[in-house]
């Protein structure tokens, strides 16, 4: 038997029952400075083995007596935890889990036991499961892993298999994010390649972008350190395209169009790439909204130094870049892929293989999926703590 301690700072999210709950209470140290009874803190973990578990709540700061409602909706569990100065480790009783899967535990402060004048709700550090026979029976984001990437959730990829990889100069992909699956932080990347990526993002409640970036050949996360001979150079851009440099995930040239794309619409992305005679390779991205135009719009064209390449390593991905929304599921469809070589000969896209990032590979998060829908094309899904699917890394999907 062993005890499993699940840290709030790596595995919890907050939601609000009122229109205005602006404070963020979740830090790596736990849930801190929590005053609002309209805020619900939700902690997630995955159980691989059914069984009975004792649970307790660990705090390392209690300012005054307070009461927190603890509920597990899927188990019809409800408990009122009353804290005083002696309640740094408070037993919540036992739970019985009959089926493997994700468990969500909600915490909400009661209005009657807290007053802004007298201090905060108790600081929540960890939820402890006791009587665990096998440590590997409980999966969650470990403190040894990045809380940023763990709370973001797993990124998932489709790696396209073409009948030929030689001299691919043009690639087209259609991407649709279904209605209600477009949470803030979503990046449905339509066309990735060895030197950059191109797709659409939800950047906030009020802004969405069509983003195209190309990496510099100099390996650095600091764009200001790139030597002049390693700079990615802008060749041309669309009328309303914004141009920046980027860092923290490699560095290079960034271009984006602020655009109010809509969930449920299939948008068209086209990428051209070829080696120039000047030692650069040229990469140009175009976007088309089928609801508004029959023509593609130029996003930007970049040239990359010390590179002689057509389009290689073609893939798509779905990620969440906002750690505060990793508890919300995303989904995207990728359809009608077309490839052409430098002689404009069509190259068949035969299939797509599934892969994921370290968050999934190290089993910090299990909420990922991918496959094929013969009507809507290949799909990717991630985040939201849905129960694990049977898809595995390396699975190959083919459309009829």
Predicted feature locations:
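Extracytoplasmic
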Residues: 1-260, 268-275, 279-400
């Amino acid at each position: 038997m062993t005890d499993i301690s699940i840290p709030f700072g790596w595995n919890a999210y907050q939601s609000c029952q009122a229109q205005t709950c602006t404070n963020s209470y979740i830090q790596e140290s736990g849930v801190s400075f929590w005053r609002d009874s309209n805020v619900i803190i939700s902690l997630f973990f995955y159980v691989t083995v059914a069984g009975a578990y004792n649970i307790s709540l660990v705090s390392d700061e209690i300012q005054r007596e307070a009461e927190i409602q603890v509920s597990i909706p899927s188990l019809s569990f409800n408990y009122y935890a009353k804290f005083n100065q002696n309640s740094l480790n408070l037993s919540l009783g036992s739970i019985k889990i009959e089926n493997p899967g994700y468990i969500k535990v909600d915490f909400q402060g009661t209005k009657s036991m807290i007053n802004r004048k007298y201090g905060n709700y108790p600081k929540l550090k960890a939820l402890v499961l006791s009587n665990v026979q096998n440590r590997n029976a409980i999966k969650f984001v470990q403190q040894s892993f990045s809380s940023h990437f763990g709370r973001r959730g797993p990124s998932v990829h489709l790696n396209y298999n073409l009948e030929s990889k030689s001299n691919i100069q043009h690639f087209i992909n259609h991407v649709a994010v279904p209605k209600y699956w477009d949470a803030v932080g979503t990046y449905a990347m339509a066309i990735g390649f060895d030197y950059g990526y191109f797709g659409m993002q939800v950047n906030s409640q009020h802004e969405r972008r069509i983003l195209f970036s190309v990496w510099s050949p100099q390996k650095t996360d600091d764009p200001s350190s790139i030597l002049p001979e390693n700079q990615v150079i802008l060749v041309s851009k669309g009328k309303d395209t914004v141009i920046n440099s980027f860092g923290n995930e490699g560095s290079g040239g960034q271009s984006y169009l602020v655009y109010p794309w809509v969930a449920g619409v299939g948008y068209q992305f086209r990428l051209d790439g070829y080696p120039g005679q000047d030692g650069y390779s040229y990469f140009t991205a175009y976007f088309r909204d089928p609801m508004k135009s029959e023509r593609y719009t130029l996003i930007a064209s970049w040239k990359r130094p010390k590179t002689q390449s057509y389009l290689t390593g073609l893939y798509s991905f779905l990620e969440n870049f906002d750690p505060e929304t990793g508890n919300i599921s995303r989904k995207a469809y990728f359809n009608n892929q077309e490839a052409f070589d430098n002689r404009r000969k069509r190259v068949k896209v035969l299939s797509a293989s599934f892969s994921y990032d370290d968050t999934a590979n190290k089993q910090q998060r299990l909420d990922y999926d991918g496959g094929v829908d013969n009507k809507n094309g290949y799909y990717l899904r991630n985040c939201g703590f849905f129960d694990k699917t049977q898809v595995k890394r390396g699975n190959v999907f083919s459309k009829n």
